[in-house]
């Protein structure tokens, strides 16, 4: 069963529409669907809501610590409510998936994502669920003929808003991910994963 859903992003209006905040977009949508309001909760270092989703009580969290310190918020809430790593789902932007793709998986490395790296360090575990929301990679914007030796600026890419066509694809992927949330929250995470991946996300 999933008891805590975390969306990763950076705090501040200047980051709201940037690719790195895709995790926030998903949690914002979940809160809206539940009629819950995310409020600043200092003991959890983020915006927090307790929501009733699909008949289950679920904690929603958006760390306000900046991305590379996200673990501080996650571990504070997980310890307070005695939530196990396997009961946590972290939604985050994923460079290695194109816009329009979303994948669910349990465990694994950080893939260079500083938010995941910090969460794994604070939990002393990598065994939590990740919802990877594809944002594409800056190398995809470089003409193939010019890619050899090119060094795409990843930091600049993730801190910029997606193009309109990319945003539409990302929004569609988030909708597909939301459609499998009832299954995931009730603990049928493997089934949710198969549904999401089968639906072309």
From Swiss-Prot:
Subcellular location: Cytoplasm
CDD domains: PTH
EC number: 3.1.1.29
Active-site feature positions: 20 (proton acceptor)
Record's protein name: Peptidyl-tRNA hydrolase
Residues that bind tRNA: 15, 66, 68, 114
Record-marked site positions (Stabilizes the basic form of H active site to accept a proton): 93
Lineage of the organism: Bacteria, Pseudomonadati, Pseudomonadota, Betaproteobacteria, Burkholderiales
């Amino acid at each position: 069963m999933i008891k805590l859903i975390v969306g990763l992003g950076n705090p501040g209006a200047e980051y709201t529409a940037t690719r790195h905040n895709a995790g926030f977009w998903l949690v914002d949508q979940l809160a809206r669907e539940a009629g819950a309001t995310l409020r600043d909760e200092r003991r959890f270092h983020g915006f927090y809501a307790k929501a009733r989703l699909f008949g289950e009580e679920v904690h929603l969290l958006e760390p306000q610590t900046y991305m590379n310190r996200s673990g501080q918020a996650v571990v504070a809430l997980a310890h307070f409510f005695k939530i196990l790593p396997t009961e946590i789902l972290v939604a985050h932007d994923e460079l290695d998936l194109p816009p329009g793709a979303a994948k669910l998986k349990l465990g694994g490395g950080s893939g260079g994502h500083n938010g995941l790296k910090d969460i794994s360090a604070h939990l002393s575990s990598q065994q939590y669920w990740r919802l990877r929301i594809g944002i594409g990679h800056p190398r995809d914007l470089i003409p193939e003929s010019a890619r050899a030796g090119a060094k795409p600026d990843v930091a600049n890419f993730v801190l910029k808003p997606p193009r309109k066509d990319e945003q539409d694809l990302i929004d569609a992927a988030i909708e597909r991910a939301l459609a499998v949330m009832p299954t995931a929250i009730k603990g049928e995470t493997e089934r949710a994963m198969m549904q999401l991946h089968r639906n072309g996300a």
